[in-house]
Regions:
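Extracytoplasmic substrate-binding proteins
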Residues: 60, 152-226, 325-351
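Sec-dependent bacterial lipoprotein signal peptides
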Residues: 1-30
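Structured C-terminal subdomain patch of bacterial secreted/periplasmic proteins
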Residues: 278-351
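Short helix-initiation/N-cap motifs at beta->coil->alpha
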Residues: 58, 122-130, 261-270
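Proline-aspartate-enriched helix->loop->beta-strand connector
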Residues: 131, 138-144, 162, 274, ...
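Bacterial lipoprotein signal-peptidase II cleavage site
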Residues: 28-48
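Alpha-helical, coiled-coil/dimerization segments enriched in small aliphatic residues
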Residues: 232-265
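A short, structured surface patch at a secondary-structure boundary
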Residues: 78-131
């Protein structure tokens, strides 16, 4: 099951370690070398862009000089940094969908292309920021534009290095905005603009090969809990990627949303309300085929028109699920050729 990013954190622990972090950070940064670590590429870009200020929902961050030691947190930021030809000094460890070492496949391929080594991997499964591990990485900047950082975490990390958080809500930054934010923070806006354009072109080209998708409605959900669906709202990046491919959000997504305004990127729907879903495609992710079979064997699920008529687009496999759940300029090209045919096969069944 794809881990759902956690909005809540254990705040008491922060209070206990905050002062220790400040002291440790001061010692670490005082002794920090200005050179990039072995295996890390030069950031290049426009050194004249600094100082630069990046605004976020948690506060403005000023970066005085071009960062050389980059730490990423959350989803996607490490993809963007790697796509720019830079290997972060530390990034999250992904036990779901990652390699044996905890590196996402497209990141592992890119690190190999760059001739580098796997960076320090940060404990990520708990959803809590591993502050001591971040301090040990000696960052010049911490990039977390697609994350669930709390205000307390942001403030604590800001004592270690400048922190770049999300512009509006946690876990809701589009892949385009993530890329632009990272580009600004690193003084590489020309490069990130080019990455966005290249990615948009690849999406448009593939969408044109599957005109059956254009204008079809979809309802994106996940069966992460017994008897309930997690339904992804319009501002979720995985939903926006389907919009890029020409699909339209089903009116059912908003019509069945009884918890609007709660600040989350998804809401829960009971199986008792499945019959109220009206959509061309039902798009869902699963870790393996047996999970698909278990889901569709439920009588309430089996009775859904989209399931009965083969209009369920089941995205199967942890790596493909992660790549399309956290789309980026690196994961989108890696996944599209596997993703779009599944969507098109379901769209062909629409009468």
């Amino acid at each position: 099951m794809l881990p759902v990013p956690r909005a809540s954190r254990r705040r008491s622990r922060l209070a206990l370690i905050a002062s220790a972090i400040v002291a440790s950070a001061a010692l670490v940064l005082t002794g920090c070398s200005a050179g990039a670590p072995a295996g890390q590429s030069s950031t290049g870009g426009d050194t004249g862009a600094f100082p630069v200020t990046v605004k976020s929902a948690l506060g403005s961050t000023t970066i005085d000089a071009k960062p050389k030691r980059i730490v990423t947190w959350g989803w996607g930021a490490q993809d963007i940094v790697l796509a720019l030809g830079i290997i972060p000094v530390a990034m999250p460890k992904f036990t779901y969908s990652g390699t044996a070492d905890g590196v996402l496949p497209w990141d592992a391929e890119r690190i190999t292309e760059l001739g580098g080594k796997t960076p320090q991997l940060l404990t990520f499964d708990t959803g809590e920021v591993p502050f001591e591990e971040v301090v040990a990485a000696k960052p010049d900047v911490i990039l977390a534009p697609y994350s669930g950082l709390t205000q307390t975490e942001f403030d604590t990390l800001s004592k270690v290095a400048p922190v770049v958080a999300y512009p509006e809500k946690p876990w809701s930054t589009s892949w385009r905005d993530q890329t632009a934010i990272v580009g600004k923070a690193l003084g590489m806006t020309k490069q990130t603009d080019a990455l966005v354009k290249k990615t948009e072109d690849s999406v448009s080209t593939l969408a044109a090969k599957y005109p059956v998708l254009k204008g079809k409605t979809f309802y994106y959900a996940a069966a992460n809990e017994p008897g309930k669906l997690n339904v992804y709202r319009a501002d979720d990046p995985r939903v926006q990627l389907l919009n890029d491919l020409g699909l339209k959000n089903s009116p059912s997504v908003a019509a069945l949303d009884s918890s609007k305004g709660d600040g989350s990127f998804f809401y829960q729907l009971s199986y008792e309300k499945l019959s109220q879903i009206d959509t061309d495609l039902l798009v869902m992710y699963f870790d393996k085929q047996s999970s698909v079979d278990a889901f569709t064997s439920d009588p309430l699920v089996a009775a859904m028109p989209a399931v009965k008529e083969g209009r369920l687009a089941a995205i199967v496999g942890e790596s493909l699920v992660m790549a399309t759940s956290a789309p980026s300029v690196l994961s989108i090209p890696w996944s599209l050729d596997r993703y779009v045919p599944v969507l098109a096969a379901a769209a062909e069944k629409v009468k």
